[in-house]
Amino acid sequence: MPSPRTPRPLDHLVLPVEDLDTARSRHSALGFIVAADARHPFGTENACVFFADGTYLEPLAIASREECEEAARTGNVFVARDQAYRFRRSDNGFSAFVVGSNDAEADHARFVELGMSGGEMLAFSRPMTFPDGSQQTASFKLAFASDLRSPDFFGFSVERINVPAAERSALTAHPNGVEGISEIILSEPNPTDFQYLIGELCNNRETEANSFGMSVELNGATVTVFNKAGLETHLGIVDPSRERGLLGRAVVYRVSDLQALAALLLKNNVTARQVAGRLIVDPAPGQGAFYCFEEIR
């Protein structure tokens, strides 16, 4: 029977980086346009990469360690999780995926009821700078979901309040031809152990499982969790570790012309390999996940 739920849209991905200059340089070499630096009111900063499909990447850095530590001490889940990720993994990675929401408070109540709340909601405002140089104050509400068995990956929903529609065509016309995100890839030795967490975040309880892992559909994108066999077959990654818990691994992008992208990467001295019809660029400073590019059919 089809699910009565409506899958959420993918909003963005959180990608911890050591500093924004390195992230900007790396993503520019990959053929992305990177937006202006922006600061959060709790000590972190980002330089986002926006896409025509409404999704975006959030390379996230520490602007003020003192402000971040104070925010974490006073219950800011977003900062506390970022601090923990950097301590446990590194300053270069993929720590969370985010879905869009019209009611973050209802999401929080549902996460609490289901025993998967990641902590108290976060509400904040900050100025936004648009390509024409204008600024407006935007407000956000975040509801967090997590699993104690998975300390290095979490998710949340975001509700935007009084955020005006922005003309971002200048920021989405990427030289590499990327038009959006088609899939995000996580890993875990036994993926279905986390099907309820992923399903609730996606607002979709229909799970497609096979010998390589499982997938849950968002509105416009797919969340896939691979086991070790799936990582090796689909990404060419051999992982000898025995650790458990979800890990953010890869982002799959829709690109208009794979051959043109390959030429751009070669020109910019970016190494890529081909696996199952996709171009894959391995992580590097400023790029904490595998980036996979597939041509739009």
Where are these regions (language model features)?
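Glyoxalase I/VOC metalloenzyme domain signal
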Residues: M1-L10, L15-A35, F51-F124, T129-R297
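Short glycine-biased active-site loop of nucleotidyltransferases that positions the nucleotide triphosphate
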Residues: R39-H40, A47-F51
